[in-house]
Amino acid sequence: MFTRALLLSTTLVFGACASKPVQPELAGPPPAGKPGFEDGELVQAVSQHLGVTSESAASAIERLFAERGRPSAYITGEEGGGAFTIGARYGQGTLWMKDGRKERVYWQGPSVGFDVGAEASKVFTLVYDLDDPDDIYRRYPGVDGSAFLVAGMAVNVQRANGITLAPVRSGVGVRLGANIGYSSYTRKRGWIPL
């Protein structure tokens, strides 16, 4: 039984790695009249929330701005998770819209792949193309093997129904490997990560 699960997870991981990753088109600045956060605002917010230097925060923000443009919202929060081939991640935070609206959000999700370890981290998620806070509540697939490191912070991209999330994580623990899974954003805390 364990051999079948390991074979299945291996197939899924290598299949995900061999296929072209789902990447949203590179976005420039948002169209005129559409609100978006400026890089200076976000560098300060990332630095304060994640407890990193302004230079480290600027490195991550500059790369995301160059690839995706200005976000319409962001989420500040914390999360924890662990895995041994099959894993789970749980988090909570606050969604901050450019127009001043804010809302409490929770997320959880399963993963499968070559993945072992546990971590706890603070998360700063840039949110693109979100006009209504209610639209964030859905599943966002992702391949954590697609993450990149900038100044000691891990960043990956998730996308669903035209909304793109770019979580920036900084924390403690070790979780090594590559996995595929999704994060499900909800209004209430959930304990079952499906």
Stretches found by the model and what they are:
Residues 18-20:
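Bacterial signal peptide processing site
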Residues 1-7:
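Bacterial N-terminal signal peptides that target proteins for export
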Residues 8-12:
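Hydrophobic helical h-region of N-terminal Sec-dependent signal peptides
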Residues 22-194:
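Small-residue-enriched, tightly packed secondary-structure blocks
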Residues 14-16:
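C-terminal motif of bacterial Sec signal peptides marking the signal peptidase cleavage site
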